[in-house]
Curated annotation (Swiss-Prot):
PROSITE patterns recorded: SM
Protein name: RNA-binding protein Hfq
Pfam families according to UniProt: Hfq
GO CC annotations, alphabetized: cytosol
Subunit structure as annotated in this protein's UniProt entry: Homohexamer.
Gene3D superfamilies: 2.30.30.100
A GO molecular-function annotation: RNA binding
Species annotation: Bartonella bacilliformis (strain ATCC 35685 / KC583 / Herrer 020/F12,63)
Function according to Swiss-Prot or TrEMBL: RNA chaperone that binds small regulatory RNA (sRNAs) and mRNAs to facilitate mRNA translational regulation in response to envelope stress, environmental stress and changes in metabolite concentrations. Also binds with high specificity to tRNAs.
Keyword RNA-binding: yes
Similarity annotation: Belongs to the Hfq family.
One GO-annotated biological process of the protein: regulation of DNA-templated transcription
PANTHER family reported in the protein's UniProt record: RNA-BINDING PROTEIN HFQ
Length: 79
């Protein structure tokens, strides 16, 4: 069970990192990035694609879409 004190973005990013799920990230300027999260902190996400790393600042992100359905919470109801 996920502690309620954790931020949803941290739970989401931790899940896709552990499961190595490919993401599509849209930036506020319209740029589309794809890759796998290798690390993240309060300010940025490290994205890997084709052996190259990209450091993406969270304030530049508009939308993150996983490449497949993910299960974040046990029971998977509306949280």
């Amino acid at each position: 069970m996920v502690e309620r004190s954790q931020h949803l973005q941290d739970v989401f990013l931790k899940t896709v990192r552990k499961q190595e799920i490919s993401l599509t990230i849209f930036l506020v300027n319209g740029v589309k990035l794809t890759g796998i999260v290798t690390s993240f902190d309060n300010f940025c996400i490290l994205l890997r694609r084709d052996g190259h790393a990209q450091l993406v600042y969270k304030h530049a992100i508009s939308t993150i879409m996983p490449g497949q359905p993910i299960k974040i919470f046990e029971g998977e109801g509306c949280e």
